[in-house]
Amino acid sequence: MAGSVAIVGIFVALLAVAGEAAVFTVVNQCPFTVWAASVPVGGGRQLNRGESWRITAPAGTTAARIWARTGCKFDASGRGSCRTGDCGGVLQCTGYGRAPNTLAEYALKQFNNLDFFDISLIDGFNVPMSFLPDGGSGCSRGPRCAVDVNARCPAELRQDGVCNNACPVFKKDEYCCVGSAANDCHPTNYSRYFKGQCPDAYSYPKDDATSTFTCPAGTNYKVVFCP
């Protein structure tokens, strides 16, 4: 009997976790093909214009990212390279992409049973993006970065036709909020450029107050490239 009770308890716990998993619908509305990437769950998939991809992430997933890769070529084994967002020369990503790339970031079922999510330009920008709750939870707010940041990118930040951030370009403490600037980091002229283009998005590592969004655990989400 004790064993049966334990099994039932485990089953109920698994159902509870599954009930708070999040489904991410990734949609490509760009007028070109992208190779969507998602870690630590999902891997990667080619998305032609108008195509979508559904990813289920379990409750408790942290340090997660979704992004678009562009200009990719892969062989039949899934090996190749991308002009932007490349993740080690493979279609199925297991690690983060190479800057510059626009990032959707999330952590599920964290403090106060909340999901935390954002769009980050700390690694630069390659395609416009929105990251919004996908109905049903009563949660409606999320970040949008729908402008073409590349169009007015400062010349010194331009790379491969897209726009890098100052941190990966100059690797200085004041741009990366590390070392001497770890506890006293402020916006710079470069981060202000990104913030002016996309007020909802992270423009530098300490940009939490205006760039972090929350929804109740169990919310589903939609990430749109070129909204």
UniProtKB/Swiss-Prot annotation:
Source organism of the structure: Zea mays (Maize)
Keyword Disulfide bond listed: yes
GO biological process: defense response; defense response to fungus; killing of cells of another organism
Gene assigned in the entry: Zlp
Keyword set, alphabetical order: Antimicrobial, Disulfide bond, Fungicide, Plant defense, Signal
Family indicated by similarity: Belongs to the thaumatin family.
UniProt-listed Gene3D superfamilies: Thaumatin
Signal peptide stretch: 1-20
Cysteine pairs bridged by disulfides in the record: C30-C226, C72-C82, C87-C93, C139-C215, C145-C198, C153-C163, C167-C176, C177-C185
The UniProt record lists the keyword Disulfide bond: yes
Record-given protein name: Zeamatin
Protein role: Has antifungal activity. Inhibits Candida albicans and Trichoderma reesei; marginal inhibition observed against Alternaria solani and Neurospora crassa.
